[in-house]
UniProtKB/Swiss-Prot annotation:
Subcellular location: Late endosome membrane; Lysosome membrane
Membrane-spanning segments: 4-24, 41-61, 84-104, 120-140, 155-175, 203-223
Known glycosylation sites: N106
Cytoplasmic face of the membrane: 1-3, 62-83, 141-154, 224-256
Bilayer topology annotation: Multi-pass membrane protein
Entry PTM: N-glycosylated.
UniProt organism field: Rattus norvegicus
UniProt protein name: Lysosomal membrane ascorbate-dependent ferrireductase CYB561A3
EC number: 7.2.1.3
GO BP terms in the entry: intracellular iron ion homeostasis
Pfam family of the protein (one): Cytochrom_B561
Job description of the protein: Transmembrane reductase that uses ascorbate as an electron donor in the cytoplasm and transfers electrons across membranes to reduce iron cations Fe(3+) into Fe(2+) in the lumen of the late endosome and lysosome. Reduced iron can then be extruded from the late endosome and lysosome to the cytoplasm by divalent metal-specific transporters. It is therefore most probably involved in endosomal and lysosomal cellular iron homeostasis.
Subunit structure: Homodimer.
Length: 256
């Protein structure tokens, strides 16, 4: 039962993450005119898509690498590399998303970083950068002692959850801000809840749902990578279920 709930949560998470990206892309394509890289508002349209993809979906996926039962046994280094690489990919996508909005603001002579959304977003990205470099230096490079890693691990996990929470808050405030900007025409104000508002609000609900599920899996003690010799009953069941599934796959695809 525990194993089934874990893998069902992973499937739901994958579906929610894909829907977050697809819904944001469709919103920008269908209601906001599509995409370009020319300094116009079409360049801005890359910003929400890339920020949702990087700071929410990829970041969330990278955060859960150590929750996979396959990562609980054997060498930890490959999983550390995967964890760092996915976060680096998320950060790269985020930087491109920031480039899009700053490029649009420069082209349109719009002031940078004046709204609460922008303050929250840039703070989140700065924390993400610090978190990645600290994690790379302490947990991936071999110089740090086990004592230092044990000391900083709870801090690393705490700020990881904080950054995801701030990312969700940034996305929600960004969706709201965008709708207030574009739905101020008297013929279709935001308060009349036109189709675009319903769709964008629904996208925000998807982002919140994705983030809450990531945080639930991230903070559930029975799904954390166990310390050596400290497996709980639920973790043992997850490991056994994982290897049964792996053995069944090998048997199915073995040459006759």
């Amino acid at each position: 039962m525990a194993s089934g709930w874990f893998y069902m949560s992973c499937m739901v998470l994958g579906s929610l993450g894909s829907m977050c990206i697809l819904f944001t892309t469709y919103w920008m394509q269908y209601w906001r005119g599509g995409f370009a890289w020319d300094g116009t508002v079409l360049m801005f349209n890359w910003h929400p898509v890339l920020m949702v993809s990087g700071m929410v979906v990829l970041y969330g996926a990278a955060s859960l690498v150590y929750r996979l039962p396959a990562s609980w046994v054997g060498p930890k280094l490959p999983w550390k590399v995967l964890h760092a690489a996915l976060h680096l990919l998320a950060f790269t996508v985020t930087v491109v998303g920031l480039t899009a909005v700053f490029g649009f603001h420069n082209h349109s002579k719009i002031t940078h970083l004046y709204s609460l959304h922008s303050w929250l977003g840039i703070t989140t990205v700065a924390l993400f950068a610090c978190q990645w470099f600290l994690g790379f230096a302490v947990f991936l490079l071999p110089w740090a002692s086990q004592w230092l890693r044990s000391l900083l691990k709870p801090v690393h996990v705490f700020f990881g959850a904080c950054i995801l929470s701030l990312s969700i808050a940034s996305v929600i405030s960004g969706i709201n801000e965008k709708l207030f900007f574009v739905l101020k025409n008297a013929t279709r104000p935001y308060s009349s809840l036109p189709g675009e508002a319903v769709f964008a609000n629904s996208t925000g609900i998807l982002v919140v749902s994705f983030g809450l599920l990531v945080l639930y899996i991230l903070l559930a003690s029975s799904w954390r990578r166990p310390d050596p010799g400290a497996l709980t009953d639920r973790q043992v069941w997850l490991l056994v279920s994982h290897y049964r599934w792996d053995k069944a796959k090998k048997a199915c695809f073995a040459p006759c």
